[in-house]
Regions:
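A short, aromatic/hydrophobic, helix- or strand-capping loop or linear motif
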Residues: 54-58, 137-142, 183
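Non-catalytic DNA-recognition/assembly elements of restriction-modification systems
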Residues: 23-52, 57-68, 165
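Proline-centric
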Residues: 30-38, 112-121, 135-136, 149-172, ...
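Amphipathic alpha-helical coiled-coil/heptad-repeat segments
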Residues: 1-20, 158-214
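A short beta-sheet element
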Residues: 68-72, 76-135, 139-152
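Positions in alpha-helical segments
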Residues: 24-27, 109-112, 149-153, 176, ...
Length: 214
């Protein structure tokens, strides 16, 4: 979709439209700025699975959020990750979804914890993994699943740290604007649906004649 294309374009081409591009040799990346490095995820942090947690310990309210394979699943009174990390859905239809953790959180064994090194900007890496569309790594015909090994070996484009930060700031703003426009459009759609329902109701109950506006 449009938002995904904006993200992928920014993390693979940068913000300077006049920069010289060269082939990366990687399908999802395409051409990249000449000065950028092509590397792998595994060189910029450690990746491990989260931990098991019983359903009884997951509540509707609590101190620490609990993240599973498809997102937030509840709250707990304990956490297993307190560093700046990225949680990656490992199991489920939405496997490959990513979220930046900046406060203590419990990550279940249906997700991966990517603890970042200081060699990469955390927000840039978040946008980079979104652009890489990790869901494509799922090769299971039954339960959707991706592994830490597959994520570690994903090729990524990496500019300088300052350029990473500029791209991350741009995408924070741009994607917030896109989300706002989507929300406004969705609200208009819901309003039209409600209007349609009212017209149908008025017509079938005889409260409105043909050609009359409700």
């Amino acid at each position: 979709d449009y938002k995904q294309s904006v993200i992928t374009e920014a993390v693979t081409k940068g913000l300077n439209l006049d920069v010289e591009l060269v082939p990366s040799g990687i399908d999802w990346i395409g051409d990249v700025p000449k000065e950028w490095e092509i590397t792998r995820v595994k060189f910029y942090g450690t990746i491990r699975s989260g931990d098991g947690i019983s359903i009884e310990k997951i509540k509707d309210e609590g101190t620490y959020p609990v993240w599973g394979g498809n997102g937030l699943i509840g709250y707990s009174e304990k956490y297993n990750e307190s560093k700046t990390s990225i949680v990656i859905g490992r199991v489920g239809a939405l496997c490959g979804n990513v979220r930046l953790l900046t406060s203590p959180t419990f990550v279940s064994d249906n997700a991966l914890i990517f603890r970042l090194s200081d060699k990469v900007d955390s927000k840039y890496m978040l946008w980079l993994l979104i652009g890489a569309d990790l869901n494509r790594l799922n090769t299971s015909n039954a339960q959707p699943l991706i592994t830490g090994t597959k994520v570690k070996n994903v090729f990524i484009p990496l500019p300088s740290l300052s350029e990473q930060q500029s791209i991350a700031t741009y995408l924070d703003t741009k994607c917030s604007e896109i989300d706002s426009l989507i929300a406004i459009k969705q609200q208009k759609i819901e309003t039209l649906k409600d209007y349609k329902k009212s017209v149908i109701y008025e017509a079938v109950t005889g409260k409105m004649t043909i050609g009359e506006t409700p």
